[in-house]
Amino acid sequence: MNDSTFTLGIVGARGHTGAELIKLVAAHPRLQLAFVSSRERAGQRLADHHPEFQGELRYENLDADAVAAKGVDAVILALPNGLAAPFVAALEAAKPDTVIVDLSADYRFDNAWYYGLPELTRGRYNGQKHISNPGCYATAMQLAIYPLLDLLAGPPQCFGVSGYSGAGTTPSDKNNVELLADNLMPYALTNHVHEREVSVQMGVAVEFMPHVAPHFRGITLTANLWLNRVQTREQIVERFQQAYAGEPLIEVVDEAPWVSRIAGRHGAQVGGFTLAPGGKRVVVVATLDNLLKGAASQAMQNLNLALGIDELTSIPH
């Protein structure tokens, strides 16, 4: 068995997702963390922020050329939307076979990139070095819709609620705990980037209404699905069980899942499966941790896949 190690760098390591990535890398037997880039923490020891990581590695403030000059096997870009392109260009120029996993939305609509939602798109992976990690809401939406895709009679309506960690670390109303107290904040109620993302990936128009809640982490996604023919609940449940059979990170549950039960866990739960009278409308609920299956854990699945390592290495399941 080949047990060679691979070198990895993380750009955007200060954020919530970067922190989860560092934990996963620290537990990975075949990844060596070569650098972590964070403008705000430059010079600080990684171990002082992440006790699970041993060693003297320090945060650096690296621009695109400096990242490319490191010559690592793989780079994870955990940056806000719109910032990935210079890093991608520099890495392509310096070492074209570098595996790049981008967590932003920047390349989710680029057919030259593999769209990495492994449970749904694993069959499309064909050695691509550039991987676009799906959005957190987008992952939950697709898991709720996919098993019924051929039965849809119209656009799925998806009501999403996320913990405020999804708003990142840059201060805003959507991560202000005082403003969020006893509150629910609707935002981007049409044309959210994840609405567009899922519409492209599923090949069907999706209507998505996101909200931010006072809890820190975890997404609840409630999908209202109109069907083109009558179904029983048993038929619906069987479709989901068949779709996710053999997928350790996707759990099909009978009752509607609670976000409090998925926070801190690396997979997703899908359940509820409530049919309206007449059998042509069903409501499905999906929950996942937006920082894990919605970001870091999924990125690790994709990185493992690209490096030829067992997909779930370092991911508790």
From Swiss-Prot:
Stretches of the chain forming a coiled coil according to its record: none
GO molecular function ontology, one term from the record: NAD binding
GO cellular component: cytoplasm
One matching Pfam family: Semialdhyde_dh
Subcellular location: Cytoplasm
InterPro entries the record matches: AGPR_AS (IPR023013), AGPR_type-1 (IPR000706), NAD(P)-bd_dom_sf (IPR036291), NAGSA_dehydrogenase (IPR050085), Semialdehyde_DH_NAD-bd (IPR000534)
Domain of life: Bacteria
Pathway: Amino-acid biosynthesis; L-arginine biosynthesis; N(2)-acetyl-L-ornithine from L-glutamate: step 3/4
An individual GO BP term: L-arginine biosynthetic process
Primary subcellular site in the record, as a coarse category: cytoplasm
EC number: 1.2.1.38
Annotated transmembrane regions: none
Main enzyme class: oxidoreductase
Keywords for the protein's UniProt record, in alphabetical order: Amino-acid biosynthesis, Arginine biosynthesis, Cytoplasm, NADP, Oxidoreductase
Annotated active site: C136
CDD domains attached to this UniProt entry: AGPR_C_ARG5_6_like, AGPR_N_ARG5_6_like
Catalytic reactions on record: N-acetyl-L-glutamate 5-semialdehyde + phosphate + NADP(+) = N-acetyl-L-glutamyl 5-phosphate + NADPH + H(+)
Described function: Catalyzes the NADPH-dependent reduction of N-acetyl-5-glutamyl phosphate to yield N-acetyl-L-glutamate 5-semialdehyde.
Family: Belongs to the NAGSA dehydrogenase family. Type 1 subfamily.
Protein name per UniProt: N-acetyl-gamma-glutamyl-phosphate reductase
The species this protein was found in: Stenotrophomonas maltophilia (strain R551-3)
